[in-house]
Amino acid sequence: MNDASIATLQAAILAAHRTRFAGQDGLPAQPTPATDDGADPIYQAALSACSQLGFIACDAHTLALAWQRQSQRLGAFDASLWPSHAADFGLSAPDPAHAFAPCPQQLGLYAVLPDADWVGRMARAGVPTVPLRFKSDDPTAIHAQVQAAVAAVQGTGARLFINDHWEAALHAGAYGIHIGQEDLDALPAGALQRIRSSGTRLGISTHGYAEMCKAHAVHPSYIALGAVFPTTLKKM
């Protein structure tokens, strides 16, 4: 397939989906990552189209691979069919032996809270899921806050997740742990197995297709997707 044919496939994807991703102002187009000359034409077309739609390089690559697999699975390229089949993203059902302890399918209101006092207030008010996001470099303060948060939810039925501080969470017996992508990359060898074998639930933050696929490979209890809307809490 020549460059003109690839450009035709790219244009077909853009025509079918540009409105879908326009939003209020639309996302700015991203540079198309370089590819090998022998790359699959559908992959090349989808990579360029997804970059034009505003997907960053890793997400455009993940989508392009999914589009290539989708076309192979269906036996034809369909520009109107946005990839959504798990197998096209290389995903499969987790092996129960490697999965983390499960959470309810519906976690309800998920209120990210700055300290143990807020955790207690929201748990007593009936908020079902209360993640503690306590930011500090002081190990003593971290352990004190985590232990206080665990005590604060006793008898309320609230599910307490500890953000980032996984060792303190294990020590205090928290319901679950939540980590971001950077924390996932920084975990020491054996940390995931320690969390898994303890029966503690694990949640992982994601912000796009590539990170969701990466998180899925860990078989966590749940995967969080955000920020859907702009946030002032951290730089995204």
Where are these regions (language model features)?
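Conserved N-terminal beta1-alpha1 strand-loop-helix module at the mouth
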Residues: 1-175, 197-204, 215-221
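Glycine/Thr-rich beta-alpha phosphate-binding loop at enzyme active sites
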Residues: 171-186, 203-236
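Short amphipathic alpha-helix with an adjacent loop that forms part of the alpha/beta core around
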Residues: 191-195
